[in-house]
Design a protein with these regions (language model features):
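N-terminal cap/lid segment of alpha/beta-hydrolase-fold proteins
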Residues: 1-29, 278
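Catalytic nucleophile-loop/oxyanion-hole region of alpha/beta-hydrolase
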Residues: 14, 45-48, 71-106, 110, ...
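The serine-hydrolase catalytic nucleophile loop
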Residues: 42-54, 68, 252
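Conserved alpha/beta-hydrolase
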Residues: 55-75
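Alpha/beta-hydrolase-fold enzymes
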Residues: 122-202
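Short beta-strand/loop motif that positions the catalytic acidic residue
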Residues: 234, 240-242
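Conserved alpha/beta-hydrolase "acid-adjacent" motif
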Residues: 247-253
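Catalytic active-site module of serine/aspartate enzymes centered on a nucleophile-bearing elbow/loop
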Residues: 269-301
Length: 301
């Protein structure tokens, strides 16, 4: 029997669209310490985030889990566009909504992000001193380092498609899409040995739409962003969950971020990038470590 409720809410975002969110509220007395959560590159909330939010809610933490604009059930056109600026804005929109909610505790507000969302976690934590803490899980925090893992011939083909899509967008042409998760011999954004394992592990089982694609122009945004450089300005507690055998997100920059942040903490999870999720090698221990971090810092806030 669960000890929480889940409600779907929609939060206005930008001039003409909104964010589709799940709000988890524990049965304990309000106001609740709260975790604002979102997925990584191409991810939607139905793709593996519920087990984390449910575990937190079962242990007394509210959770606000949202789809970025252009993704999942949130609004925005074109579909499957990744904009770092807009995704940061979406986190801030969700945080602002949480701060206005009577059932959520302003003084115990955390942000949580997985994979590519590690970029946003460092950026936002460095600019929002009111946060009680931040968690970045199997995080990508250095775009050039991430792109450096892509073999040169494949990187050239991806870049050419991205530039063509960007120029086409300027002239009003429909977006060019790239596959997101593919096998190592195919052309796609994530072409690691475990990419298809991750795709299958995270695929929603409730019919939630999750196209395995991304607008090609999105890669140009990713390639140059380096929020690891902001780690030294983060004043809130920061937990970096870094997978020991991550083949997608470079572990060096993530480990450096934990060391540079004045209140940084590091947990090295067993296995690869997708082993932090339900069904993965270290999912249970990752839940335990993240809850301990949240509980400890919620008590001090």
């Amino acid at each position: 029997m669960t000890d929480f409720t889940r409600e779907q809410v929609r939060i206005p975002a930008g001039a003409d669209t909104d964010l589709d969110c799940w709000q988890y509220l524990p049965s304990s007395p309000a106001p609740h310490p709260t975790v604002v959560m979102a997925h990584g590159i191409g991810g939607v909330k139905a793709a593996g985030l519920a087990p984390f939010a449910e575990f937190f809610a079962d242990n007394g933490f509210a959770a606000l889990v949202f789809d970025y604009r252009h993704w999942g059930r949130s609004g925005g056109s074109p579909r499957e566009l990744l904009s770092i600026r807009r995704q940061r804005e979406d986190y801030r929109t969700a945080l602002a909504w949480a701060r206005r909610h009577d059932s959520l505790d302003n003084d115990r507000l955390f942000i949580w992000g997985t994979s590519f969302a590690g970029m946003h976690i460092l950026d936002i934590a460095a600019s929002d001193p009111a946060l009680a803490g931040a968690i970045a899980q199997c995080p990508l925090v250095d775009g050039p380092a991430g792109m450096g893992k892509v073999p040169a011939p494949r990187a050239l083909r991806l870049t050419a498609t991205a530039v063509a899509d960007l120029l086409g967008g300027v002239t009003g042409k429909p977006p060019k899409y790239l596959p997101l998760s593919v096998g190592p011999d195919s052309l796609g954004v994530i072409a690691t040995d475990d990419a298809l394992t991750g795709l299958h592990r995270l695929s929603p089982d409730d019919g939630e739409p999750w196209p395995n694609r991304i607008t090609a122009r999105s890669l140009l945004d990713i390639a140059v962003h380096r929020p690891v450089r902001a780690a030294g300005r983060i004043r809130c507690p920061l937990l970096m969950v870094v997978a020991e055998s991550d083949t997608m997100a470079p572990t060096g920059p993530a480990t450096q971020a934990a060391a540079r942040a004045p209140r940084g903490e590091l947990y090295r999870s067993r296995g690869g990038h997708y082993d932090v999720y339900a069904g993965g090698l270290d999912h249970t221990d990752v839940l335990r470590v993240e809850l301990e971090f949240l509980t400890r810092h919620a008590a001090r806030a």
